[in-house]
């Protein structure tokens, strides 16, 4: 099993096996002051190996600061990829997830969204939070 995509966005939706992303793939956020609050969309696409289908798995996504300290929120989801009629034997099956919610950024620095399945880290999306310069 592997994570095909882990993307941070302004908004994300998962509909009919597709991810819809608005304002995605950013890696630098500018804030006039800290602590800062934003709404973040998290989009995840998972390729499930044929031999791992028809079994329950658990996805966890959490945020970390540069020192590896976990931050709220932590998001979890159980999933199972079933083999649909007509699926090619041996082919991976893709599962998509999207969630939107608040994220508090305590100060300038480096942060990561970390995705794990069954306790194994499979993807990391890094970003920087910087102080926006004030215009006169």
Give a label for each model feature.
Residues 2-117, 121-136:
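Contiguous segments within soluble domain cores/interaction surfaces
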């Amino acid at each position: 099993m592997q994570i095909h995509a882990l993307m941070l966005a302004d908004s994300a939706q998962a509909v009919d096996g597709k991810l819809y992303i608005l304002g995605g793939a950013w890696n630098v956020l500018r804030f006039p002051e800290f602590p800062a609050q934003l709404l973040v969309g998290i989009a995840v696409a998972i390729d499930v190996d044929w031999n791992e289908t028809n079994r329950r798995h658990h996805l966890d996504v959490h945020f970390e600061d540069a020192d590896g300290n976990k931050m709220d929120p932590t998001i979890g989801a159980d999933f199972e990829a079933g083999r649909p009629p007509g699926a090619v034997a041996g082919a991976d099956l893709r599962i998509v997830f999207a969630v939107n919610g608040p994220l508090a950024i305590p100060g300038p620095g480096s942060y990561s969204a970390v995705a794990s399945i069954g306790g194994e880290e499979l993807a990391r999306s890094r970003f920087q939070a910087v102080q926006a310069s004030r215009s006169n």
